Amino acid sequence: MKNALKKIVTPILAALLLSGCASEETPPKKSDASASASAAQSSGSEDNPPIQKDSFYPTFDDNEDYASMKDKLAKQIDCILNSDTPPFSMYLNNKAEDISKWKKTVTKTEKDGNIYISAIYTDPSDSLLATLSATLFQDSPTVDFTVHLKNTSDKNSPIISKLYGMDILVSLPKQGNHFTLNTTQGCGVQGSEDYDDFGLETYKLLPSTWRTFEPKQGRSSDEAWPFFDILGDHCGLLVAVGWSGQWKARFSEKNESVAIQSGMANLNTYLEPGEEIRTPSYSITYFEGDAEYGHNIFRRLILKHYTPNTETKYVCKLPLSMSALADRTETVFKSNIAAAAKYGVPVDNLVIDAGWYTDVKPEANGIVSGSIPWEKWYYQAGNWSFNTSLFPNGNLKSLSLMAQKNGIGVALWLEPERAHSGTHMIDNHSELYFSEEAGGVHLLNLGKEEAREWLIDYISNLIEENNLSIYRQDFNMTPEWFWDNEYPFDRLGIAEIRYIEGLYYVFDTIREKYPAVLIDSCASGGRRMDIEILKRTVILWRTDYCCNTYGKNFFDEGTQFQMQSLSYWLPLHATGVGTDKFESYNFRSALAAGINFNSYISEENAEDAKFLVSQASKMRPYYYGDYYQILEPVYDFKSWQAYEVWRNDLGKGALVVYIRENAKETV
């Protein structure tokens, strides 16, 4: 990192301190804000032109660097598989099952450099069959695995509980006299929309003491984070849980090693004859070096194996999006597109967010007075047809074609998993939902084939009829109660498993049918992020923090904190600017691999809009590279903040520095 940083930091800081802006272009007009921001690039001269579009697809020449780490990880895996203690565990009829007595068969195959492992365990009575399927990646010191459990008998199985798909001891040298575990708070810990989403949490692992984590009420990153690092002496692990529901993970020190257990939080069920269930998936990355190095290996892993490919077979490109609630008519949206094209603002995408299905009426100017009220867009979920007062044709086809001619895609918001009593879906298709409701809220039962097929057909029609480039699926409810109350206690967990499997099936089917269409996963912001979701979707709205009132309970410094904290783990995510202005400090606070901003571009703000969006476009590819926290993320109004994004394959990067309102002149 230091070698890379030396290439750009000295000239950039010199320019920053002299001019307040290190870009080669003319900066936008000065704002009244006393705070300033700088974003600088190490490219753009005549001899060194700006990076081109294909630079969104990084090439990683890192296999040699990983050889020793991959070898050590493979030996750990062999040690675990060859031991009497299996790498998973369960209780049967409330007693710990001794799986070491089960018959075990392990096979390995190699394809494209990856090593595929199948470990099959059969209980002595030949009634339960457990299959551990693992992949040891050729291009990363990482193993990915899942356990499936099947009842192969002709009668119900014993009650299965405490099924940990990962129950392992990993040998690491200690960091001093202990291991250190890091994770984050997840999304929404302090409230529905809070500045410290994804703030780092650090713990010591102690013998005989379990440190336990699980999310809130069924969304995988709601007040918890299914990603962890465990640090030893100049080495460590990155552990990820792949379950978009109610997972559980716990960590401890045991016999000078790290003990890890993880599975579903709520499981107490028998299996019917022939019935099969699965555990969460898991990813373990081993690294040698400091935590920053390990996290950059993990970011590269996410790009290589846990990011959806577009039809070009490359890692996806997050858009620069004009974004708005559906609080205006199609004519006004068309004028927004026309203005962006007229003034040369390099917009990729127009996001039409919630409200297009409500019964609101626009004023004579085509705008809904006061925008879409919360009680409209929220409680009318389930009326999934276009408001013809806003969209006279009952679709977006004309709007999408006009946008496409100007090189702009269209994204549309939908929240199909939730519906309210009194809406079309509940009045006409209540059989597709869970049998219980909560305060008029209903949850689509994706464990039912007919519900899955309805949703696939509806999304498919939405994409085709409206020529969508991005489909945004939101999820503004907590599903755990619905899952846990669908069946008797001796079938606890089955509804959740079938629901999560159904969710993945829907996303996989849509991805297969429309490989050029991105699925944007939103869940009250970023409350459903895990490796299974990341494999299938992108995160274009990482938090609802910027839905708050600017200057009251939303500040640019919070956006900066979230960007720096989340980027330590994941490379691809985006957020909203949060205001209707194009002001440099505010806009640059939201810089990331993608960005959402005001759709009202006019002669008055066109110069600033073009400058800032163009700068975001030029910087965007660097976020696909390695990430370095130059200064530790802090939420305040007096510090400097700085981070670097660096593309080793290009030998180029960017340094972003924020000088906050009450900051001292030097740092």
Model-derived segments and spans:
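Short Pro-Gly-centered flexible turn/kink motifs
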Residues: T269-E288, L655
